Amino acid sequence: MAEVQVLVLDGRGHLLGRLAAIVAKQVLLGRKVVVVRCEGINISGNFYRNKLKYLAFLRKRMNTNPSRGPYHFRAPSRIFWRTVRGMLPHKTKRGQAALDRLKVFDGIPPPYDKKKRMVVPAALKVVRLKPTRKFAYLGRLAHEVGWKYQAVTTTLEEKRKEKAKIHYRKKKQLMRLRKQAEKNVEKKIDKYTQVLKTHGLLV
């Protein structure tokens, strides 16, 4: 059986529920999905209201033994994971298998920093929300309800961006040199190019 291609999604700028619904559908269909930068996911509605909702959720617990659940995740990646779980039949084998195909991360850890990341236009805030509507960042909400690694994630992201900038600069330089090299030998290899074109080996 052919290996299933991994779909790497950049969570930044997407709406929580819409992205979760699309991800849930994809994992049920058998795709492996990785969502990075979960701290950049948006939630529609102003921040204060969303925080009140989450604080109300934190109060829901088992009176006699709170350690039995429900479990309240604080990290943005886990909050997103739980949202997707709510859209899956996770108590069945099929749902559990689908949930196992999902990976979520805060920031962009290796090896995903070197991979092409995609967006989902149907879930983007700029597409789905009116410009005047209020929204909140999942990272800020998580930080204010107990997530302890916002500063660490921000620092690591800044380092990653700096490395990516240097890599892109080098790549551009190499492309420029390659174009120049091709231009320099264009006249020398022209007769060979024509032969290859006549045989249909070069377009």
Swiss-Prot record:
Modified residues annotated as N-acetylalanine in this record: A2
The disulfide bridges present are none
Q: Which GO terms describe its cellular component?
A: cytosolic large ribosomal subunit; GAIT complex
Per the record, residues carrying N6-acetyllysine are K191
Chief localisation class:
cytoplasm
Q: Name one GO biological process term.
A: negative regulation of formation of translation preinitiation complex
Q: How is it modified after translation?
A: Phosphorylation at Ser-77 upon interferon-gamma treatment in macrophages involves a DAPK1-DAPK3 kinase cascade and is causing release from the ribosome, association with the GAIT complex and subsequent involvement in transcript-selective translation inhibition.
Q: What positions are modified (Citrulline)?
A: R59, R140
UniProt modified residues of type Phosphoserine: S77
Name where it's found. Cytoplasm
Q: Which UniProt keywords apply?
A: Acetylation, Citrullination, Cytoplasm, Phosphoprotein, Ribonucleoprotein, Ribosomal protein, Translation regulation
Gene Ontology MF, one: structural constituent of ribosome
Keyword Transcription set for record: no
- Functional description taken from the UniProt entry: Associated with ribosomes but is not required for canonical ribosome function and has extra-ribosomal functions. Component of the GAIT (gamma interferon-activated inhibitor of translation) complex which mediates interferon-gamma-induced transcript-selective translation inhibition in inflammation processes. Upon interferon-gamma activation and subsequent phosphorylation dissociates from the ribosome and assembles into the GAIT complex which binds to stem loop-containing GAIT elements in the 3'-UTR of diverse inflammatory mRNAs (such as ceruplasmin) and suppresses their translation.
Q: How does it assemble?
A: Component of the 60S ribosome. Component of the GAIT complex. Interacts with EIF4G1.
In terms of HAMAP family, this protein maps to: Ribosomal_uL13 (MF_01366)
Task: Say which family it is in.
Answer: Belongs to the universal ribosomal protein uL13 family.
Q: Which NCBIfam families match?
A: L13_A_E
**Name of the protein in question:** Large ribosomal subunit protein uL13
The species is Macaca fascicularis (Crab-eating macaque)
- What lineage is on file? Eukaryota, Metazoa, Chordata, Craniata, Vertebrata
